[in-house]
Design a protein with these regions (language model features):
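Conserved phosphate/ATP/ADP-binding segment of small-molecule kinases
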Residues: 162-232
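A short acidic, helix-capping loop that chelates divalent metal ions and anchors anionic groups
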Residues: 23-27, 85-93, 153-158, 186-190
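A short helix->loop->beta-strand "cap" motif at the edges of active sites that frequently abuts
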Residues: 12, 140-145, 211-213
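Surface-exposed amphipathic alpha-helices with a cationic face
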Residues: 4-9, 67, 71, 137-138, ...
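Asp-based, Mg2+/Mn2+-dependent phosphohydrolase catalytic module
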Residues: 1-44
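Conserved N-terminal subdomain of the carbohydrate kinase-like
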Residues: 45-51, 71-147, 151-154
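Glycine/serine-rich anion-binding loops at beta->alpha junctions
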Residues: 52-71
Length: 233
C-alpha cells in the first residue's frame, strides 16, 4: 500500500511498477517505487525544451539534431513533429507532412504534462501548420520561443511554400524571443542582398526592428566565412 501511494504521489501508474516487480514481493515493489520517484525528481531538476520541427532521416538536422543538442546541454528534450522527410547529406527526396489535427494532438499531449521552459520551432512547411502552432503556443502562454525560419535545406532543397513564408512572418515571428536565420533566410526576411559582413549586420538590424527580438544570423552560407552574428538591443 505504501509503495502504491508513493508511486501515485510521483505521478506514475501503479501497473508500471507491478510489471517490473514480483507481485508478491512488497520490498521489491517499494524499491521500484523509490526508483521511479528518484528518476522523476531528477527530471524535475532539469530545464525542459520542446522542439517543433521536421524529422531528418539522416539525423543531421531537424528534430534529431535538436534533441541531441538539448541533451548535450543537460536539457530534457520533447518534440512535436511537423513532417517526416527522406533526406541525407546530398538532398531531400521526400516530405510527408502531418495533419494540423495531429500536430495539435502532439502539442496538447506534451504541454499539458511537462510544460516546456523554452520552445524551438524549425521546419514548418504549410500555412495550416504554422497557424496551428501559433494558436497552441498562445493558448498555453509559451515563453522563450526560438524560431528558426527554415526555408531551404543546406543541400538547396526548398522546404516551405511562398504562402507559408508570409504566414510565418505574421503568425510566428512576432512571438519569437530569438530568430535564427541563415544568410538566404535573412535575405528573404530583410528583403536585401547579403554579400559582406556589414550586410549581415544591416539585415539583422532590420529583422530586429520588425520583430523586436534578438536575431542570430548564421553565417554558414556565406562565401567568405561561417561566422555567426548575434544582434540584440
Amino acid at each position: 500500500i505504501h509503495a502504491v501511494r508513493t508511486a501515485k504521489k510521483a505521478g506514475f501508474q501503479v501497473v508500471g511498477i507491478y510489471d517490473e516487480a514480483s507481485k508478491d514481493d512488497q520490498e521489491e515493489i517499494q524499491r521500484e517505487a523509490d526508483c521511479y520517484c528518484r528518476d522523476w525528481r531528477e527530471l524535475m531538476k532539469k530545464k525542459t525544451a520542446l522542439t517543433i520541427a521536421g524529422s531528418d532521416s539522416s539525423g543531421g538536422a531537424g528534430i534529431q539534431a535538436d534533441i541531441k543538442t538539448m541533451q548535450a546541454n543537460g536539457v530534457y528534450a520533447m518534440s512535436a513533429i511537423t513532417a517526416l522527410t527522406a533526406q541525407n547529406t546530398t538532398g531531400v527526396t521526400g516530405i510527408m507532412e502531418v495533419s494540423p489535427e495531429f500536430l495539435e494532438n502532439q502539442l496538447d499531449a506534451v504541454i499539458t504534462d511537462i510544460r516546456p521552459d523554452a520552445v524551438k520551432i524549425g521546419m514548418v512547411s504549410s500555412e495550416k501548420l504554422i497557424k496551428t502552432i501559433s494558436k497552441k503556443l498562445k493558448e498555453y502562454h509559451a515563453e522563450n520561443i526560438v524560431v528558426d525560419p527554415v526555408m531551404v535545406a543546406t543541400s538547396g532543397s526548398r522546404l516551405i511554400s511562398e504562402n507559408a513564408i508570409e504566414t510565418l512572418k505574421t503568425q510566428l515571428l512576432p512571438m519569437a524571443s530569438v530568430i535564427t536565420p541563415n544568410i538566404p533566410e535573412a535575405e528573404v526576411l530583410a528583403e536585401m542582398e547579403i554579400r559582406l559582413e556589414k550586410d549581415m549586420v544591416e539585415a539583422a538590424k532590420k529583422i530586429n526592428e520588425m520583430y523586436h527580438c534578438a536575431v542570430l544570423c548564421k553565417g554558414g552560407h556565406s562565401l567568405n566565412d561561417a561566422n555567426d552574428l548575434l544582434y540584440q538591443n
